[in-house]
């Protein structure tokens, strides 16, 4: 929560990840596993809100915040990019719960996901919400447990004809691909670049027409 409040104070937009808990509530965290950030070998989707409150971030007094608490703390003062983290085919419930929560947020926001099912759900059920397709080169990703066909389809954004995203978000180092050029000139989709680590990357991305997502520096 401290990082979100700092971004609010600096007037920076925020990109955050949302997970669906066992009790149907939402929490904000990057990984599904709590191991890297708390040392506990448990997945966030297997916990209730009450159980999650027992885990602290590394050696701090900070806990993993509920999505509702983050929205209340920000008070609509900064724009949000909300990434949906789908696990075990929970995409419909995750999408529905997130959209219902965002309906009460006074600021501007958009929603994105690596999972095209989430993007398609938004297109069919909440076309009023700006939606984005996140992707990487899945052939270079060690964590991608997918078939060759799915790696090809997701890397080259073939499913965009179904999901029709308003923007595509691609890893900065992999942004110069044929599929991104197709998205720019054929689909006319806005492009977003993540995650920029320094001012040089930030300036290059902006000059090339990408909306920047950055961390660990102030542009």
What is the predicted role of each segment?
Residues 1-219:
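Phosphate-group recognition and catalysis centered on beta-loop-alpha active-site segments
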């Amino acid at each position: 929560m401290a990082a979100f409040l700092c971004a609010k104070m600096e007037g920076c937009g925020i990109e955050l990840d949302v997970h669906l808990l066992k009790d149907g509530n939402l929490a904000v965290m990057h990984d599904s596993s709590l191991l890297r950030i708390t040392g506990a070998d448990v997945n966030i989707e297997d916990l209730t809100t009450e159980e999650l409150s027992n885990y602290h971030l590394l050696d701090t007094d900070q806990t993993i915040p509920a999505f509702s608490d983050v929205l209340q703390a920000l008070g609509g003062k900064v724009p949000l990019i909300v990434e949906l983290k789908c696990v075990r085919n929970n995409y419909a419930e995750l999408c529905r719960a997130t959209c219902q929560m965002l309906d009460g947020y006074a600021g501007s926001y958009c929603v994105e996901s690596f999972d095209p099912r989430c993007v398609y759900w938004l297109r069919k059920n909440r076309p009023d919400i700006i939606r984005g397709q996140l992707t990487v080169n899945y052939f270079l990703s060690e964590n991608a447990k997918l078939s060759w066909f799915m790696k090809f389809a997701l890397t080259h954004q073939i499913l965009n004809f179904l999901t029709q995203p308003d923007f595509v978000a691609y890893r900065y180092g992999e942004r110069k691909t044929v599929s991104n050029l197709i998205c720019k000139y054929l689909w006319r989709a806005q492009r977003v670049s993540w995650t920029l680590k320094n001012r040089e990357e930030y300036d290059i991305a902006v000059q090339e027409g990408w909306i920047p997502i950055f961390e660990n520096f102030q542009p």
